[in-house]
Amino acid sequence: DRYEADTLHNLSKAGKPLLVRYDLAGVKKALTKDALRERPDGLWKWRELLPVRKCADIVSLGEVETPLISLPKLARKLGGGEIIVKDEGRLPTGSFKARGLVMAVSMGKALGITHMAMPTNGNAGAALAAYATSCGIKTTIFCPADTPEVNVSEIELQGATVYRVNGLIDDCGKIVGEGKAKAGWFDTSTLKEPY
């Protein structure tokens, strides 16, 4: 099945995650290397390769292009080839989760979402709350009861309402899914939003 990009979706009719496809041939024609060189560095430099169509819908907290760092001592110690890590800790919320959630929130803004919810026990909730709060989208987070206090505090400080659930992350996910119709939130659970 085909699903239009400018419509709200969670899973496919078959209950499977949706994957976004881009017209790379069209992007190649529309975007030149010279145009890229003239743009400021950062995630949105690559906007033609991202799902947000209008610049006015971009939600940003200053995402940077995160560097690749070579670890030659570790490579020697392990006796293998080159080891390179990507330093995603430089993203605004200090986690790679910011990279995906900036897209989810920007698309949510573009599609008129006013309330987002997710199950999490940490970084994803903080990233969702930071981006959503920055553009006026209400955020509700469900965490297992044993989620470390520092994680819950970070999510709350970013502007979300947090509920602790006596159960596992799957139980939190069920609450988000079941509460969608009643609470009117968009389910931003992992693999339940395509961006």
Regions found by a protein language model. Give the residues of each.
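PLP-dependent amino-acid enzyme catalytic core
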Residues: 1-195
